[in-house]
């Protein structure tokens, strides 16, 4: 593979995460405007965004098999057509049913693109470099989560209709579409060139189960925590601005942490540093929940920094449980993480209703403790060291 081809594929991976980050995180910015557009209360409107998450979940799950049937380049180009149709549907329709369908299609497109992006990085890079590259790729999710809410605020403040925000997000996919030209993708399944000797199917091992549970608990814990921090802070008497600043501080330090750890991870055994980071994140979250108001900004800043590498390290370790990175295995762990996203309000909503926001934060803290236990247990069964050693020879 030529270096320019590798660079193009890497940029497609970066932009695939930016696309999903933009679609997921911009929701809160435009929800009120969309509710006004359809003359509905915001609480009713939030339910329709479940179609976006459902689309992401279904596409990540199905793409483990689709990748072996439909070439990656074809998927990305067809996704561009679907993106245009979905954005056109948002612009031209006043029907809530068509809005929900367009959101579902956007979810499908971003889920397929993100699973392809993750797979490309696991194919292009080996060992510790794979972990640092995946982490840098994941930082584009956070970066888009910072940039596109600002774009949305800029457009909405000038009374420009909300659907133009989605047209702007579509420009990210336009860049992906352009990059597919003159670019060779790894072939999979029936499209791959098979050697004379059939490849032996590798068993995943129990380590993959530990990582799948860790992925689900981590995402559910993280989103359950950050979703209820503003309500918890307001309950302590903090202003709305100060409560919002806690969330901004978390994501800002999370992004800086990703950049820092994309360099740091190269020098450590991934399972060991993951266990340390999961343990530190669990302690820091507990200190945030039980600490004084004066210390809360410091605890959430350090929590964001030290938890930033956890999810990507889980995916990287998963890809290293087999000698050859398996798209089904990577997509299985991604699917578990996405299930965590889907369950966020299903799990935390009733807890808040019965026991208040602090109980939801303590539940999230318990989920982080489960992540720590899973990562610690993985140390006894992980195959990443033997596969890294054999790749080095």
From Swiss-Prot:
It is a multi-pass membrane protein. Pfam families: MFS_1 (PF07690). Gene3D superfamilies: MFS general substrate transporter like domains (1.20.1250.20). Coiled coil: none annotated. The chain crosses the membrane at residues 11-31, 51-71, 78-98, 101-121, 134-154, 162-182, 206-226, 245-265, 273-293, 298-318, 332-352, 361-381. It is found in: Cell inner membrane. The keyword Cell cycle does not apply. Keywords: Cell inner membrane, Cell membrane, Membrane, Transmembrane, Transmembrane helix. One of its GO terms (molecular function) is transmembrane transporter activity. One of its GO terms (cellular component) is plasma membrane. InterPro entries: MFS, MFS_dom, MFS_trans_sf, MFS_TsgA, MFS_TsgA-like. Belongs to the major facilitator superfamily. TsgA family. This is Protein TsgA. The lineage of its organism: Bacteria, Pseudomonadati, Pseudomonadota, Gammaproteobacteria, Enterobacterales. The gene is tsgA.
């Amino acid at each position: 593979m030529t270096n320019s081809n590798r660079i193009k594929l890497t940029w497609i991976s970066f932009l695939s995460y930016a696309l999903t980050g933009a679609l997921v995180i911009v929701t809160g910015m435009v929800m009120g405007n969309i509710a006004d557009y359809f003359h509905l209360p915001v609480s009713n409107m939030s339910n329709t965004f479940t179609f976006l998450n459902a689309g992401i979940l279904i596409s990540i799950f199905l793409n483990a098999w689709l990748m072996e049937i439909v070439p990656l380049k074809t998927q990305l180009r067809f996704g561009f057509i679907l993106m245009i149709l979905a954005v056109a549907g948002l612009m031209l329709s006043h029907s809530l049913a068509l809005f929900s369908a367009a959101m579902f299609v956007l979810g499908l497109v971003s889920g397929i693109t993100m699973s392809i992006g993750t797979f490309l990085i696991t194919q292009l890079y080996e060992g510790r470099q794979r972990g640092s590259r995946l982490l840098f790729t994941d930082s584009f999710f956070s970066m888009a989560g910072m940039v596109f809410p600002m774009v949305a605020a800029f457009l909405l403040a000038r009374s420009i209709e909300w659907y133009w925000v989605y047209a702007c997000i579509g420009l990210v996919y336009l860049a992906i579409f352009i990059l597919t030209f003159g670019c060779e993708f790894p072939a999979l399944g029936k499209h791959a060139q098979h050697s004379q000797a059939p490849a032996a199917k590798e068993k995943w091992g129990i380590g993959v189960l530990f990582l799948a549970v860790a992925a689900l608990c981590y995402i559910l814990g993280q989103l359950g925590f950050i979703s209820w921090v503003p309500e918890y802070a307001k309950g302590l008497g903090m202003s709305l601005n100060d409560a919002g600043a806690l969330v901004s501080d978390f994501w800002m330090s999370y992004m800086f942490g990703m950049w820092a750890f994309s360099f740091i991870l190269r020098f450590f055994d991934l399972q060991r540093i993951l266990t340390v980071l999961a343990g530190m994140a669990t302690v820091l979250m507990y200190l945030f929940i039980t600490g004084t108001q004066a210390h809360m900004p410091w605890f959430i800043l350090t929590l964001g920094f030290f938890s930033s590498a956890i999810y990507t390290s889980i995916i990287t370790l998963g890809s290293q449980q087999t000698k050859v990175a398996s798209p089904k295995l990577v997509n299985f762990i991604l699917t578990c993480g996405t299930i965590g996203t889907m369950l966020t309000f299903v799990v935390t909503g009733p807890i808040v209703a019965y026991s208040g926001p602090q109980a939801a934060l303590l539940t999230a803290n318990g989920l982080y403790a489960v992540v720590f236990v899973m990562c610690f247990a993985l140390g006894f069964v992980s195959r990443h060291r033997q596969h890294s050693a054999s790749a080095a020879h």
